[in-house]
């Protein structure tokens, strides 16, 4: 099925790194800076509230922060621009790579595959994540949707990635966790796809698309 693959493209959040794990660290840091008097169980409870309202990272910051301000009755809250900037600047400094992800990238690189990264999100935030993770050098290209104005699942961002590496859809494999943004988007661009199912989108497998529980399983389904 994947005999002619030359390039493998990856999503980042919840494919290679645990967004929830990284966000938990950010929540703790945020509360320490803005609410230093809140400690112990009270701090944990507020971190839980931050996690519960972020919608897995798919809610816009412009919608998220007003919700938190209202929930907490935060009378002296900074303005929205300040809070959005805090998120985009500081969240990316916390990265929790998923088990086996870095080792898998290195193994694929050693096999001679070209590696690409295609991730949705704010440019500063996502680029900071890649730098914090220390994996940028493993990739032959990386594109953040915000940098080119095209967001997954629009096929344009996948076509941009393939053009950058000089490969055709038949020579390209996309690996991601989101059944629409990653899998349907890649298929719409003519690419092959593998769905990494960590359980967030249970029951949303795409017929004919291989499913793995961890990116390391890709090594078993690729020749070589």
Question: Across the structure, where does each feature detected by a protein language model lie?
Answer:
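Asp-based, Mg2+/Mn2+-dependent phosphohydrolase catalytic module
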Residues: 1-8, 21, 36, 102, ...
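Residue-level marker of alpha-helix boundaries and capping positions
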Residues: 56, 95, 117, 173-174
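N-terminal helical cap/lid subdomain that shapes the substrate entry/recognition surface
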Residues: 2-99
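Short beta-strand/loop segments at the ligand-binding rim of alpha/beta enzyme cores
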Residues: 113-115
């Amino acid at each position: 099925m994947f005999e002619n693959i030359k390039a493998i493209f990856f999503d980042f959040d919840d494919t290679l790194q645990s967004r929830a794990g990284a966000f938990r660290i950010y929540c703790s840091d945020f509360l320490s800076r803005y609410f230093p008097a809140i400690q112990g169980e009270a701090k944990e409870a507020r971190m839980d509230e931050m996690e519960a309202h972020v919608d897995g990272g798919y809610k816009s910051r412009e919608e998220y922060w007003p919700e938190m301000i209202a929930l907490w009755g935060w009378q002296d809250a900074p303005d929205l621009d300040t809070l959005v900037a805090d998120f985009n600047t500081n969240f990316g400094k916390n990265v929790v790579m998923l088990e086996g992800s870095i080792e898998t990238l290195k193994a694929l690189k050693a096999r001679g595959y070209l590696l690409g990264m295609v991730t949705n999100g704010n440019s500063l935030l996502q680029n900071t994540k890649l730098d914090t993770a220390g994996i940028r050098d493993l990739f032959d290209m990386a594109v953040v949707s915000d940098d080119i104005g095209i967001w997954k699942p629009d096929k344009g961002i996948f076509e941009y990635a393939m053009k950058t590496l000089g490969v055709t859809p038949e020579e390209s494999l996309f690996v991601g966790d989101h059944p629409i943004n990653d899998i349907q988007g890649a298929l719409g661009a003519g690419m092959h796809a593998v769905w990494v199912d960590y359980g967030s989108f249970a029951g949303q497998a795409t017929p004919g698309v291989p499913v793995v529980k961890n990116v390391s399983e890709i090594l078993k389904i690729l020749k070589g």
